[in-house]
Amino acid sequence: MIKNLINVKRLFLTACCSFALSLGWAAINEKPFVVPELKQWSGADGMFAPSGKYIVKGGKQAEKVAQVFAADYHSLVGNSLTPKTGKPSTGDIVLVLKADKLLGTEGYRLDISDVTTITASTVEGLVWGTRTVLQLSEQNHSAALPKGVAVDVPEYGLRGFMMDCGRKFIPMSYLRSLVKMMSYYKMNTLQIHLNDNGFRQFFNGDWNKTQAAFRLECDTYPGLTAKDGHYTKAEFIELQKLAEQYGVNIIPEIDVPAHSLAFTHYKPEIGSKEYGMDHLDLFNPETYKFVDGLFKEYLEGKNPVFRGKVVHIGTDEYSNAKKDVVEKFRYFTDHYIKYVESFGKQAAVWGALTHAKGDTKVKSQNVMMHCWYNGYADPKEMKRQGYKLVSVPDGLVYIVPAAGYYYDYLNCRELYNTWTPAQIGDEKFDERDPSILGGMFAVWNDHAGNGITVKDIHDRLFPALQTLSTKCWTGAATSLPYDKFDSLRLNLSEAPAVNEAARWPKGKMLVIDNLCPGQTTGEKEVGYGYRVEFTVDGADEAKGTPLFTSDNATFYLADPQDGCLAFEREGYLNKFKYKIAKGKKVSIAITGDNKKTCLYVDGKLREELGPLAIYAMQQKDLTSFQSPDPTAWQPVMYNPSAKMYYQRTLVFPLQKAGEFKSKVTGLKVSF
């Protein structure tokens, strides 16, 4: 590793010297801002002005990268990039795919002079080079690039994120956006946690009523797939194909033998009577038949549903109460590592073998272990045993939205200033220790039913993604102070053609003098930090009449239950204690941020819907906060010590006006 780094520096210095000589030693452009930070940069004089043409050298694989690049370039800066052949001319962008050991499997070289050239030895490296050019392009009004040379090789080969889709359904549309966001920031691993369950204390202490879901279409066990949201096998395959185009590896996770309530709901006889129905019974042969059949469905054949090289088998948080169950857990873990490998995949596990210390051998060679808590898996001992470690320390990089424990929002300042993947809990390894593959962060949706939406998750996820991408790529070598990083990162898009936060440019407003029923506005929604104002001459509105709808939310002039001003998103109905009376003219304003949604009537604050701490003892105390949809499950708290913080945020919908009778005038939306 050290020899390779020396060679990279030698390559960089050689490139810089030749570049500087050609420009008469004029080197004035400072290192440009991108995320993650460029590892090495030598500035030159002047700016590169794009011609709108690109050349590809490297065959069909490079052509595919170039096509994605051109489409993203057009989406991001509004200018077209078209292919050409022959020698490059001033303003052309050249993509070169050729062997170069010094760049490794993901590094690239970026030469920006009269011609911009991206050189990489792998498709992945070429993709990352295009992401850098895109970020540089969007920061200049004419898409001009600062002249100079960058040699950019990541410190860690695995840079990732895990999404808990089991406790909360995350729509495929968002996962596709997430792939593009991760790629834009050179994060190359997305782990999708496909099954999990809520906490029993929120569901009357009854396992049979406790939320549980397996999110993937399943033919082997008809009826297993979640009814409140799932992915078809076809769309899951398409997600992986999209990820491959963008340099992102999908790691699907089926979590067994704990966190398995979705499976015991389907087949109760394989649930543990001793440790709880969220645990599989490790001593029941039917358990192994069931789990074998489940993995087999997605792993067998020439074109399996799980396309990637790695499959995660879970093995998280099983009881270690007795010696015999510990040994059986170790047997189970070893069995499914080898079972996954029998289909040509690398197995990944959650670290648990310190918690489950025993005599039964568990395969370690070529096994990926996610080290999340050192009490469950001592990382130095796991290194000694031969596991390949992924640094995902719970006390630093776990987001559990609005739960009151772990992080609601990561401490990005602390992570940026002090953390790298070499830090696993309180254990510090040498940087680039070969046993550490890289680092990840995670979103765990522990409190199923707490009102959190995908928009809320995104608000927590995105700044963490930008920060962790830097710390996993640039490592300890970041040179920019955090405050400057935190300010400049806001100038970058989430990804080309992606705006999940519904951010508007500064100063942008939407003004409609007379809002007509059914009118479209040209805007889908507006994100946190908005103010929506309008005047209403009230009419006799039917219950369930919207003011506005979008794909993600509805704002009601008269809600479906009581006819109040209200909003609904993702199955949660939240009502203001205010009705617009027939024949009355009032001025309404709605403001919203990441914590609350507020109603103003005639200029005065009428009601603030913020986080609501619930200690409910009866089901009726929660139902008023839930969707009127009778198929929606509703969490119940029987234990006053089990507190849930119910969230009432809203990204305001603007896509289409409802079919209302009232007269709505003076609509003004600001951000």
Summary of predicted features, one role per range:
Residues 102-279, 286, 292-310, 339, ...:
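Feature activates predominantly on carbohydrate-active enzymes
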